[in-house]
């Protein structure tokens, strides 16, 4: 009977470890993306120039604000 108990504890520990690892990795990635967004102003400026638009600083600031706002909303909804 002791071997069954040991097997149950091992399986439970593995499941808890997987869940804990997933949650820690998810939190790390959320924090990393918040500190280092995947796109910055310079990349946005280059994209607009490639699309044939003349990027003004006001347009770039508006787009960055929209992207940051969208990212914040996504992070809040992911926490729920």
UniProtKB/Swiss-Prot annotation:
Transmembrane intervals: 4-24
Protein name, per record: UPF0154 protein SaurJH1_1431
GO CC field: plasma membrane
Membrane topology note: Single-pass membrane protein
Main localisation: membrane
Keywords: Cell membrane, Membrane, Transmembrane, Transmembrane helix
Location relative to the cell: Cell membrane
Family stated for the protein in its record: Belongs to the UPF0154 family.
């Amino acid at each position: 009977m002791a071997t069954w108990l040991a097997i149950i504890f091992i399986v439970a520990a593995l499941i808890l470890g997987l869940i804990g690892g997933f949650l820690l990795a998810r939190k790390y990635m959320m924090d990393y993306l918040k500190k280092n967004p995947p796109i910055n102003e310079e990349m946005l400026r280059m994209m607009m120039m490639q699309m044939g638009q003349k990027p003004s600083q006001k347009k770039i600031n508006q787009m960055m604000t929209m992207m940051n706002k969208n990212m914040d909303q996504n992070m809040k909804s992911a926490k729920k």
